[in-house]
């Protein structure tokens, strides 16, 4: 059946897109945050897993969706892909994730433990933050509505699967990308905005 837009939480007209050519993520004012929704044990089919990367600008507070990697894959590949993203960030931007969130509900704690082991073995020491998602998913994702509506979160037109999931939530067949974006946004918002201090006031 066709989805009625009025039943959905996010209006596509709210999506603000950034131009990759105009944003320099190498700038040190950007901090990188990641989140994985592995979808282990959620359904019989273990649908899509989602790895979201946000770049948060320390001064403006805006959050840019750098990467929205949503696909079907086994746990070993999820872990490998996360570590590759960390390596890519270090190689291309000179620094890795400030924080990386992983859901630890049900079977998903297993993936977090294996990710930590693999990360240490690779010498990457990913800064993993456990996120025990216990609240109602739809209500949790609904809290992201003002951030989308006010353009605090900036999207990339390349991320078609994420945008489609956003547009259809909560009526769509898949929501792993939306769930991971909400988790990533929550971790990024916990990191307070950067303030320029007057050294004179500190007696420096």
Spans of features found by a protein language model:
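Acidic two-metal-ion nuclease catalytic site recognized across multiple nuclease folds
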Residues: 4-6, 20, 184-204
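ATPase catalytic-site recognition across NTP-hydrolyzing enzymes
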Residues: 1-39
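Mg2+-dependent endonuclease catalytic cores in nucleic-acid-processing enzymes, primarily RNase H-like
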Residues: 50, 57-172
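Short, conserved, surface-exposed binding loops centered on an aromatic residue
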Residues: 21-27, 41-45, 84-93
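Intrinsically disordered or highly flexible coil/loop and linker segments, enriched in small
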Residues: 4, 45, 88-95, 154, ...
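Short coil/turn segments at secondary-structure boundaries
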Residues: 1-3, 8-14, 156-160, 177-182, ...
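Gly/Thr-rich phosphate-binding beta-strand-loop-beta motif of the actin/hexokinase/Hsp70
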Residues: 25-56, 180
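Charged alpha-helix within mobile-element recombinases
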Residues: 165-188
